[in-house]
Structures are given as structure tokens and as C-alpha cells.
Amino acid sequence: MICGKTACGKTTIVKGIANKYNEVKSYTTRPKRKGETDEYVFVTKEEFDKLASENKFINIRYYYTEYGLWRYGTPLEVLLNTENPMLILDEQGLENIQNKLGRDNIISILIEADETVRLYRSLNRDEATEQNTREIKRRIKDDDIKFKKRELYNYILDNNNLDELQKNIKFILNLDLN
């Protein structure tokens, strides 16, 4: 499980190691960002609520944003039936899944990045409207509250150098999978 604050590089990292690990994509009701392709399974509110009512998610998270309520769900069946699953989560999602599947069954990695870098990345990946800027700043501020339980993680790594970080993650995962 890869966790980290907004724009710390989680998706980039997962794409860089996807040849050995299989990404489990969360479902979401949020709109696609400009240039975003397949990072999530995008569904309507109605589709999400139907899947949730059928207990198809092991983890559900709700985020109140400048744009309204966004829903995220981790598909249970896909997670359980995927060999070497790789999943991007927030801290509460990690804790939920650890409680359900057992902490010893999960390798958890927290990715950290400087707040200035995260703000720069966020502003450059989204259209720079006043509403987007408010939402980005809200998320970055909110992350300071949502990422405090360092004891949940097996590893905590800095994303100062992407190539070095990917090497470290591959090394960690190979050690834990062998």
C-alpha cells in the first residue's frame, strides 16, 4: 500500500514499478483531471452507491471539496484476487484495510514530499482557476491533519529523487515478497 499527502508523487511511483506489481484502482465519483487517463475507475454517484450497497468495497472514503462530495472506494474482490497488489490510499484507508486484512498481511509505505513541492505540482497539474487553487490549498492543509499516524507504516520514504525512491521501493518490496 502506497500512502502520501496530495501531490507527493504516489501515482508516478506506482506507474514506475507497475511491471512487477499490479495496481488496484480505486473507484471514484470525482471528475477526471486534465490529461488524466486510467488512474481511477470513474463512476457516477449512482453507480458508486449501488456498488457500496452491494458491499463491493473493502474501504470507502468521502471527501468534502470545493466542488462537493467526492467518493472513493477500494474494490474488495479485485484486491483479494490480484497477485502482488499495489494500492494508493490515504492514511484512514490504510488503517481500515489493515484492520480488516491484518497489518502483517500488508506492506505499507508512506511517501513524503516538501509542502512547497506538493503545492507546485498540484498547481501545475490542474487548471489554475480560483476554485481549483482554493481546493488545492484546502487539501494540502487538510493533509497535515490526515497523515499523523506514522506507526501504521512499515516504511517512510522521502520523494526527493524519483529514480532513487523507485529503487528503494523495489528493494523493499522484493525483500518483503521473497
Task: Outline where the language-model segments fall.
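Conserved lysine of the Walker
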Residues: 10
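Hydrophobic anchor at the beta1->P-loop junction of P-loop NTPases
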Residues: 2
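ATP-dependent small-molecule kinase phosphotransfer cores
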Residues: 28-85, 90-93
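P-loop (Walker A) phosphate-binding loop of NTP-binding proteins
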Residues: 5
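Small-molecule kinase domains that catalyze NTP-dependent phosphoryl transfer to phosphate-bearing small molecules
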Residues: 127-172
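Post-Walker A alpha-helix
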Residues: 13-14
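Post-Walker A helix-loop "phosphate-sensing" segment adjacent to the P-loop in P-loop NTPases
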Residues: 19-26, 45
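Conserved phosphate-donor/acceptor-positioning beta-strand/loop module used by diverse small-molecule
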Residues: 84-91, 101-124, 158
